[in-house]
UniProtKB/Swiss-Prot annotation:
The protein's name: Protein FAM219A
InterPro entries: FAM219
Highest taxon, organism lineage: Eukaryota
UniProt modified residues of type Phosphoserine: S55, S85, S98, S105
Organism the protein comes from: Macaca fascicularis
Biased composition (Low complexity): 105-114
Lineage: Eukaryota, Metazoa, Chordata, Craniata, Vertebrata
Amino acid sequence: MMEEIDRFQVPTAHSEMQPLDPTAASISDGDCDAREEKQRELARKGSLKNGSMGSPVNQQPKKNNVMARTRLVVPNKGYSSLDQSPDEKPLVALDTDSDDDFDMSRYSSSGYSSAEQINQDLNIQLLKDGYRLDEIPDDEDLDLIPPSQVSPCSLIYFQEGVWKT
């Protein structure tokens, strides 16, 4: 009868020593050493074929593996230089000839600081537009919606397990 194996149970030393493959039990220690030596020889022959000597970890990279600096430059085929010549026009032209948009003469020294003058102008503009948000205090009563009138015939309530009107 097979025993159930607990996967959290630590195996005993005896079960660890048993080989999993039954054919592996027939290999002696001398055979293992011979196989290891054969693998080492094959690795040495392969490294000699590739031109590397010794351990691959200790090898320095070859100088011919580095790409030449001239090959790293990417040419600008079909692109003009970013510098603008005098005959070229800029991408965006700003017209500053018209002073109609913003009059700076109003903000000159007229007794008010520029911040006060801008604040007055903003208040005037808000009054012209019909917004008096800065002058009207926030009233919480304005935010509430009054309840609708309830007619006495539509009043139904639940009392002591019975619906009543």
